[in-house]
Amino acid sequence: MKGLHLTKAIHAILANAGITNVHAIVAEENTPQPFAVYRRASLSVDDTKDRLAQDQRATLSVQVVSMDYQSGLMLADSITNALVGKTGTFEGVYIDDISLADAAEMYNDTSYLQDLTFDITIENE
């Protein structure tokens, strides 16, 4: 199931766009801000009546953490621009479509947070 490798594909897309300081699942303690953490939040498979796997649908969750609002917003914007509408094969995963499903922002005691949710269609090649 190619969708299980989605985070590798996302890392490749972001790296190719020149976006740095992004981490799969967790960032190490004391990672310089701003940074982003991304993870596959869900994965489902569309089956045919013959139980043949078709497209896979994934949800990608991205959280941007920053000391100041503007730098976090800029990183969130760069990530969104790099991902939305992206198609092709990345790290062996054929991505048919990426769209922004939701975006929220908040502040905790020490950092500004930008939470992004992307819907991704992965084609079963």
Indicate where each model-derived feature is located.
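Small/polar-rich, solvent-exposed N-terminal microdomains that initiate assembly or binding
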Residues: 1-50, 70, 74, 78-81, ...
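Hydrophobic beta-strand residues in large extracellular and virion-surface proteins
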Residues: 10, 14, 22, 62, ...
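Residues in well-ordered beta-strands of folded domains
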Residues: 23-25, 37-39, 63, 101, ...
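Generic structural motif
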Residues: 29, 41-43, 67-69, 103, ...
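A generic structural signal for short, non-catalytic loop/turn and secondary-structure boundary residues
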Residues: 30-31, 55, 93, 111
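Short, solvent-exposed beta-strand/turn "edge" segments of beta-rich domains on protein surfaces
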Residues: 49-54, 107-109
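Oligomerization/assembly interface segments of phage tail-like spikes and tubes
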Residues: 54-68, 79, 112-123
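Acidic-leaning, charged glycine-interspersed low-complexity segments
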Residues: 81-125
